């Protein structure tokens, strides 16, 4: 680089600085490259900037120094010679007198300090300059930042792994003195983070720290407790927690601070603010963790007294929280998440462990003192919860401490008693020692079964513990719900204790839970036992199957009227057993499979018994729910499991539907069982689908004894459900033949078919048109001239299959159906058929991880609604005949009934007048649909409701009265909407209708339905209280 080029570069940098910093930075990099390649020297840059340095213009002097510093910062640390470093150092030193350049000079020193050939003498001189000449109170935060950066760079260069050299010893004390000077009075959060970090580095690495420990501690603790609220749009993203953590880390960096830290923190512990108290406790916790046993030995008495006071005065939790055994499981190990109470316990835990590791004799003295102070609480049953929590916290330290705590504590309270109050206290307090055991030895898991744990004193009390809990659960009165619930919870927690219980003891607990859940009607006992069985099944699934599930399944009789008794208890209902099976087998692999297999076998026997329809329904519902609840969980039902289940239960199910049984003769049971057949095929390996399709076609269509296309057969619904589960890409040569045959069968026999038979064939049309038959072939079967009911139904169901796959032709077909709404003879019928287009079919929906079973698009309802809405609205507005108007409104309302509310939002302004008119339609279903949409509109469009409140309120009042078309649902939703209006419409509007609503609803108080009377009372109460100021 020539001198002219250098001058040009300097001019470019100066011109772009603070305007285009990227360009200025690029120019500085170019100059640095020339220095590195030795085409110019850094001193030449100084010469080139000479005129700017001497300028009377302050801005030019600043820019010139920034230019030099930027180039210097980019220069490699080992490039400048000793002489160059010395000259540059002296140059920056000469600029110190120029107060306007303070920030730029400090930046220059920060760039120079890491240079390899800057001598220790010059570093000492720099530190002395900062100590003597730098007055932090005269500068802004952005300038005060640089001394911290200078100190950090000096520290990183000389003190990291180098504090023993003689050279470094020369600046050790000077460095600390300079830091104390620079850090004094700092308030900027960014600078404080650097200050705290430097303080920690000094106390962790430098020598002679003990000579400065009071000053170093004071320059930290003056900020405690730190409070900082970051400003909006803070560019540094510094949080209050960042500062707290940094300060805490610095305070606990050296045991030299122990004496000052403990005394000052214990003073702060008396603060009334919970936030300050929490910060103090968390800092104390870190002090105990890091300062070690020797500092605790000197301070444990003070710490114990302060912590004991906090714990005894501020107990957290009560009986209700103890009744939830999962609270502790959900706690975080993050220090920042400790409550004040938990932090006190954790400090005591660490104090004990640190003392034990430091000096066992001192620990003995500490523990004896603590136990002597707490023993009276056991005698007088005072503060027992806090007492046991303190002792269990101490016991969580290590095995030896745990054994000492157990052997000293259990004899004081683990005494069997028949007194309810004492037994409750015993069980509640025992819980804390279970937590201590789990903290120390770990939690039981499938992987840890059989892994031994160290010998411990609690094991010696195991038989006594089990006996006490067993008696509390099985011998207590049914009215003693709390005692019995607590015993279930403690048994559940004991299951989690690694290596504590033998399989035989676990089996006994499973037996207790199973018997209690069967014989006790209290919901607390039920859910406690249920959660217990779920917890046990996560670890001991085989035992739960053998002892609990088998017993439950074996209790199911073949005859519905047969009485079921357990332990001579009163008759247990079949519904209760099936509900228990459903509730606790969820997501457990073996339990789900075995339940389905057994229940299918039981169903096969029960179905052959006359008058067993209700029992069959219960069994089929349970099987269906087990499939439906676990179908998408690969850990419970994978492809291999699905195939094994199919092979195990499908022959039994087909035996039921192909012979005379209580299921074939019951339409609802048959439909539900057909849905079970859908699930048995849904997740089997795809490679098996083609073979299964061929087999089912032979059975239902061609060679089997069912042959649903020959004459009407109720099993068409089973065939349709099975087809819904199979891969849409399977080869199905006779698909159109089946489709055509189904259409012909419907047209010929529909008048004589039962409703279930007809729906079975119609759903078969839907499945075929959606996933097997081409769009062209489906449309080819449409006969728009035939306006018979059955032909219209056939076309609607075929169209539904196309709509669900977002067929391009479906929009045009829908418009033809809209045209039929104006037909005086069939318009009313067609309007009701519009619901078919969007109603859900359970076997034709999307399942997670399964994309091959149908062509249903997720957003097909939204698309269909968008296709038909404007046409329906336009036709409605252009029609004079009220009957035809009613058809359009009915069609729209029934589509709205199944359309997601978020899809309706964009159309609400056009839709709202139609909703109000739909409320007068002579059809309860239309009214319900309109009310449901209006309910959603009220929730989301407050202004629109307010504008029309004068119309809405009288309408709703009329709909709340008994009337031919005001069904229970209509009346209930109308009352709910009246109540809802008061929450979204301004008070002054609502007050004008207060009297009208209160008087108009008086007759509704005598409605025949209790649910209507209750809602009416709630609605009237809301209007009665309008404008009143509630009492606090």
Curated annotation (Swiss-Prot):
The keyword Signal does not apply. Disulfide bonds: none annotated. Pfam families: MMS19_C, MMS19_N. Gene3D superfamilies: Leucine-rich Repeat Variant. Changing residue 816 to M: In strain: SK1. It is found in: Nucleus. PANTHER family: DNA REPAIR/TRANSCRIPTION PROTEIN MET18/MMS19, MMS19 NUCLEOTIDE EXCISION REPAIR PROTEIN HOMOLOG. Belongs to the MET18/MMS19 family. This is DNA repair/transcription protein MET18/MMS19. It comes from Saccharomyces cerevisiae (strain ATCC 204508 / S288c).
